[in-house]
Amino acid sequence: MRSGPPPRSARYRRGGLAALAAMALASGMMMTVGAPASSAAQARVDNPYEGATVYVNPDWSAKAAAEPGGEAVANEPTGVWLDRIAAIEGTDTARGLREHLDEALAQGADLIQVVIYNLPGRDCAALASNGELGPDELDRYQSEFIDPIAEIEHDSAYANLRIVNTIEIDSLPNLITNTGSRETATPECDTMKANGNYVNGVGYALGKLGGVDNVYNYIDAGHHGWIGWEDNFRPTAELIAQAANANGASPDDVAGFIANTANYSATTEPYFSIDDTVNGQKIRETTKWVDWNNYVDELTFAKDFRQALINAGLPSDIGGLIDTSRNGWGGSDRPTGPGPTTGTPDEYVDASRIDRRINPGNWCNQDGAGLGERPTASPEEGIDAYVWMKPPGESDGASEEIDNDEGKGFDRMCDPTYEGNPRNGYNPSGALPNAPISGAWFSDQFQQLVQNAYPPVS
């Protein structure tokens, strides 16, 4: 079990000038809005989110506030994505890492969330998020991407700011599920497993970015609808532990893991569980939705995966994050109770589940999704926070081929007319139409996320 007292469920404080001023007035505190944080270095804490004011990205906030209903959530903290070398210094349309860190200090924030996402041969099983570095360009990843980020994050000017890094989403799980003799294997993932550059890249990032008290690294662990099967679960945990000991890294460089990054899996399924039976038939064994998975939601998965990581050699005080940015599944189609037990197991599960995707393997711009639980510190034992690491409204990928200079291809899973592949059981993609490339603003999706938010937006 996690060391220390049982966690309390509490919204962590949000950055942003309006939020800070409101808190000051409500509490009677005297404070200077925009004053820089103290230059004294912080002592390392067990859970960086506990009691923290978390940075609100003004770039995302402005886009959200401009949408109908968006003002209600525009002051929520979201992740800052560094998905190519140019993103470190910033572009014509987005500020760079140092600008974000300086803005975090100006907001009086205690914590900023950064997504490190530019491995060589990135995302070997999804064309929509391919990156700029070739499979063999580990040296460039280290010297041109990780080293400059580390130099900025380790600047003493930011010593009193907790920096949470999400390390390389989707990378290590791909080496388990999309390689070798599996039907889902790709040549690209086989290459990355053989050359070791995912493991060594993650290890280098952990070792280089870690080692200072104010930086907290969380490794991506996929989600229950990907890793929840027995032949994926422990091997993924063991591979993460291997990466935490690779290329200069130590397990002490790992603060925890994150589940459901940029995905849509429900945090909890309130109306059915993995142990349910219908007419004497176990839903785990007889339904298309569960299909022998050991989990039906992210919270149960994350709690067990945390223990699997500890068993594999990571520190006993690691914590989990769950990305709840787009897994609310509210709106008129949300069930209000369990399905009928008079029909088939499939009918029961389909009527009970709040996750309304066609298949849990569908990941791109899902139709019907909604904003999920608002960012919250210590919601459950062993879970450091619910976070919005994926900024709601940013596309998962283009619904058709779009020329771009970011190395992002066209994945048919983002095409609403696509009928599927082995990774989603040959089901329709469930993707929204007219989507831009990954990371670009997708107004139609954001408006639907607000409309289908659960808890509802008020």
Stretches found by the model and what they are:
Residues 1-40:
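Secretory targeting and sorting signals
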Residues 191, 222-243, 247, 251-313, ...:
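Substrate-binding surface in catalytic domains of secreted glycosidases
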Residues 307, 311-458:
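Substrate-binding cleft of secreted/luminal carbohydrate-active enzymes
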Residues 126-137, 180-193, 271-292, 349-350, ...:
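A solvent-exposed, charged loop/short amphipathic helix patch at secondary-structure junctions
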Residues 90-92, 122-125, 174-177, 226-230, ...:
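Extracytoplasmic/secreted cell-surface and envelope-processing proteins
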Residues 90-91, 102-110, 114-218, 235-242, ...:
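Substrate-binding cleft of extracellular glycoside hydrolase catalytic domains
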Residues 53-56, 79-83, 111-116, 162-168, ...:
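Structural recognition of the beta-strand scaffold that forms the well-ordered cores
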Residues 44-155, 372, 389-456:
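N-terminal carbohydrate-binding/catalytic regions of secreted carbohydrate-active enzymes
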